[in-house]
């Protein structure tokens, strides 16, 4: 992860990226778990 000292913390792209990734990943994992549970219950 070599971003370079030319970009200070005034541009928090890592925070936005972290928020977006978690906002998309957490519900995805929850949905996958719910679907898997439903499939196992139906079977």
Curated annotation (Swiss-Prot):
Cofactor binding annotation: With its partner (PsbE) binds heme. PSII binds additional chlorophylls, carotenoids and specific lipids.
InterPro entries: PSII_cyt_b559_bsu (IPR006241), PSII_cyt_b559_CS (IPR006216), PSII_cyt_b559_N (IPR013081)
GO biological processes: photosynthetic electron transport chain
Compartment(s) where it occurs, according to its Swiss-Prot or TrEMBL record: Cellular thylakoid membrane
Pfam families linked: Cytochrom_B559
A molecular function GO annotation: heme binding
Cofactor: heme b
Keyword ATP-binding: no
Binding site for heme: 22
Source domain of life: Bacteria
Keywords (A to Z) from UniProt: Electron transport, Heme, Iron, Membrane, Metal-binding, Photosynthesis, Photosystem II, Thylakoid, Transmembrane, Transmembrane helix, Transport
Keyword Isomerase in annotation: no
Membrane topology summary: Single-pass membrane protein
Record function comment: This b-type cytochrome is tightly associated with the reaction center of photosystem II (PSII). PSII is a light-driven water:plastoquinone oxidoreductase that uses light energy to abstract electrons from H(2)O, generating O(2) and a proton gradient subsequently used for ATP formation. It consists of a core antenna complex that captures photons, and an electron transfer chain that converts photonic excitation into a charge separation.
UniProt cross-references to HAMAP family, sorted A to Z: PSII_PsbF
Similarity comment text for this entry: Belongs to the PsbE/PsbF family.
Protein name: Cytochrome b559 subunit beta
């Amino acid at each position: 992860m070599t971003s370079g000292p030319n970009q200070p913390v005034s541009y928090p792209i890592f925070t936005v990226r972290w928020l977006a990734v978690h906002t998309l990943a957490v519900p995805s994992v929850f949905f996958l778990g719910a679907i898997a549970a439903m499939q196992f219950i139906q079977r």
